[in-house]
A protein has these predicted regions:
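Basic, Lys/Arg-enriched alpha-helical interface segments
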Residues: 1-95, 116-166
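Active-site beta-strand-loop-beta-strand hairpin of nuclease catalytic cores
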Residues: 103-113
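Short, surface-exposed beta-strand/loop micro-motifs that present aromatic residues
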Residues: 97-103
Length: 166
């Protein structure tokens, strides 16, 4: 079995991971579907999902793409040529889940926001989730820059040792 090419990271804020909370709040069939799709599709394809029915780039939100889950976990696994565990529950209802993501670094996907589009199909809800994903990405980028700024020496001199950097 091959190793996933992409690492999935949950955006964290105030000690919580909103997409993980979303995942855990779903009913069992949808939770299994999203977990199977994240680990067997997104972790292998990363931004490549945007070249398929699994994803698309979000207009007006640079760097953010939408990961789309439309099948139950058993279907996801079968489509990937993987065995389906007997304990996996197959769903007969509609599955229409969305997770908004950002790719960065060396093949890392940051999971920013998610919602059940089947439950709330309105454009208003979709727009609100995209806005939330954009805000989280902005905060995440700012947090990534802070440590880098703190680590840079001022005027080429390390404050700790008082020596010039090479």
């Amino acid at each position: 079995m091959r190793t996933p090419e992409w690492k999935l990271e949950f955006y964290e804020e105030k000690g919580r991971a909103p997409v993980l909370d979303f995942l855990r709040g779903l009913d069992q069939i949808k939770e299994q579907a999203l977990a199977a799709a994240l680990s067997n599709v997104l972790a292998y394809e990363g931004i490549g999902v945007c070249r398929s029915s699994w994803g698309k780039w979000v207009q007006g939100a640079p760097g953010i793409f939408e990961f789309r889950v439309r099948h139950d976990a058993a279907t996801v696994l079968r489509e990937r040529g993987l065995p389906v565990p007997k304990e996996l529950r197959e769903g007969s209802g509609e599955i229409l889940l969305r997770v908004f993501c950002h790719a960065h670094g060396k093949k890392v996907v940051l999971l920013l926001a998610g919602y059940d589009k089947g439950k709330e199909p309105s454009m208003k809800r979709q727009s609100a989730e995209i806005k939330r994903a954009k805000q989280r990405l902005t905060r995440w980028k700012a947090a990534q820059e802070r440590p880098a700024k703190q680590a840079r020496p001022i005027g080429g001199v390390h404050k700790r040792r008082g020596k010039r950097r090479p």
